[in-house]
Amino acid sequence: MAVSAFRGTRLPLFHHSQFPVARTVSGTSKKMIGARNFKGFVLTAQYSQTQDLFTSRLQSQIEKLPKLVEDIVQTSINTGPRGVTRLVQGVQAFVGVGGEWLNDLSKSTSASGGLPSELQLGLLSPLYLRKLFERMGATYIKLGQFIASAPTLFPPEYVKEFQNCFDKAPPVPFEEIRKILQEELGRPIESVYEYVDPTPIASASIAQVHGARLRGSQEDVVIKVLKPGIEDFLVADLNFIYVVSRIFEFLSPEFSRTSLVGIVKDIRESMLEEVDFNKEAQNIESFKRYLETMGLTGQATAPRVYKYCSSRRVLTMERLYGVPLTDLDSIRSLVSSPENSLITALNVWFGSLLACESFHADVHAGNLWLLRDGRIGFLDFGIVGRISPKTWAAMEVFLASIATEEYESMASALIQMGATNRDVDGKAFAKDLEKMFSSIQELDTEIVVATARGTNSDTTAVAANVVMDERQMNALFLDLVRVSESYGLKFPREFALLLKQLLYFDRYTRLLAPNLNMLQDQRISIASNKRTNGYKDSFN
């Protein structure tokens, strides 16, 4: 093919007028020879450049191959026989969901109309991939939740679908939990606990929680226990995902440019931290130190960790009693001003962004309570975030811009926060942000009011609760990511975590303090790089 192109004249891209005719010392004939052969010379040079580029890339891949093989071998050794077990389970899950897809496909082809996109994509479609993840169990459910909470990293169709990846699982029989407790404690559980309630308070994919009472001190506690086999499955699954990502990056440079392995490492680190209860205990202790250092122990708390009966698979914590920040009637029975309680929660959380090693990154109503003694209780530190001063500096400007509706400043802050390799039109970006943020007002919080008459009296209790639509909240993330990506911006995951917590607080504000502007009220002190010791004044 190259020879015929060299000989022919069917290459209109190469015009003689674009190039100087070769100079010669003597004779017109030599000039003509130079001109006649120039077309072939240019094509040969371009072919040579392409060949050099291919050779260079091939050489680069060959140099990377030993490292890839080493990673695969080492990962396989670390995985061990449990990898075979998970492979069999994976095949079973694949066959099950594949059969479901084929059944849906046959129904769709027999009906009139075109084939839906989720059927065209097969098991790679968001719908069937989510179903496959759920069949694969705990690791993949957690992975699905990671996808749902990271609109800055994944396509919107997958983020939306994985909102349905619920972390609910049937409880493990108590005899298995008892066995784990005895193994981890190294002695009969009766020597540590006066009793353990065999009925779990909660059960999720990786752990379940039981109420208990300590022997001797008679203190009420909760025990969080990692379910049996979770660690083996988790290591095997994460190692498999890592190997696949390494192979993809090796085969296609495109995956390398999208930092696929980096994303997988982030997922692996996040998930391994969540199943290491020693790490969660450290997160709790860090938060409690922050409260003590800032003099906030009278305003907020976190559960005490009982280290002598805790381990990597078991976490024994003080049992706190209170109500979620969404239970308005109960809050009113505990404090005279729900608004002040909310302001306290906001100040404590904002202060932790810079004054604590990590911030609580899951402040939904189940994890943020008003306790019986009037303090704010922060629960469940399995998911935390860490933010760099540089990112938070941009976030400060972003939040201030939201409050003042200065969209050019907002655009500037997002450009500073995001990673991009091209120039961004700040004014056009600001106009798009203004259109998008007008939709926030449409994210109405539903306040449900219920009345109940007492059985032995004529009194009537009125309870108000706020209902927050997670899909609406994530729709806002996706809109922001969509607009930003159109300008080539990519944000760190911490940005999505921060924004989600702020939206939780926005919903609490609508219920507990409708007239409060949490970004402008002088009683609320937003963390600043310029100060980390000014939060005490916010509580006086």
Curated annotation (Swiss-Prot):
Keyword Transferase recorded: yes
One Gene Ontology term, aspect cellular component: plastoglobule
Record EC number: 2.7.-.-
Protein name: Uncharacterized aarF domain-containing protein kinase At5g05200, chloroplastic
Recorded superkingdom: Eukaryota
Annotated organelle transit peptide span: 1-58
Similarity field: Belongs to the protein kinase superfamily. ADCK protein kinase family.
Amino acids binding ATP: I201, A202, S203, A204, S205, I206, A207, Q208, V209, K224
Enzyme class of the recorded protein, top EC level: transferase
Any one GO MF annotation of this record: kinase activity
Species name: Arabidopsis thaliana
Residue positions of the active site: D362
SUPFAM superfamilies, per database record: Protein kinase-like (PK-like)
